Amino acid sequence: MINKNVDISSLKDIFKEYQENYSFVDSDFLKIYSYVTNDKVVAFLLFNVMYEKCEIVDIFVLKEYRNKGIASKRINEIINDYAVDNITLEVSMLNKNAINLYEKLGFKKIAVRKNYYKDSDGILMLKEVRWKLWKIFIY
């Protein structure tokens, strides 16, 4: 089940496995999609939508639920739910599985941010999506 109106406090159990620490800011632009199965949050996607641009802040799926298409579906939901021109994200160059997923979804590497992470460079990736929306309206 997809939950698009998520209260951050409902994610506390999944954060036990998740290693990043966030100070969640009350923002009109921050959106959270979670994926719930058997009353348990097993994945979440944090993203900002500002006008025609979207930035994926983070994606996390519990290990036992990975490689089941959950992250791909959440990213595609952003495309379906918001009329944005593009989506950007940042990923560690060491996270080969994530890079492969993003490339499979049509993201392109556009920049490298040296020493962005404590143990690696960051790769900035971009997916152009606006033309797909226009195609829907034209045909």
Which ranges hold each PLM region?
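Conserved acetyl-CoA-binding loop of GNAT-fold acetyltransferases
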Residues: 103-111
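Short aromatic/hydrophobic contact patches that present stacked aromatics
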Residues: 58-60, 88-90, 124
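Acetyl-CoA-dependent GNAT
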Residues: 1-64, 72-75, 130-131, 138
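C-terminal "cap" of GNAT-fold acetyltransferases
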Residues: 92-96, 115-139
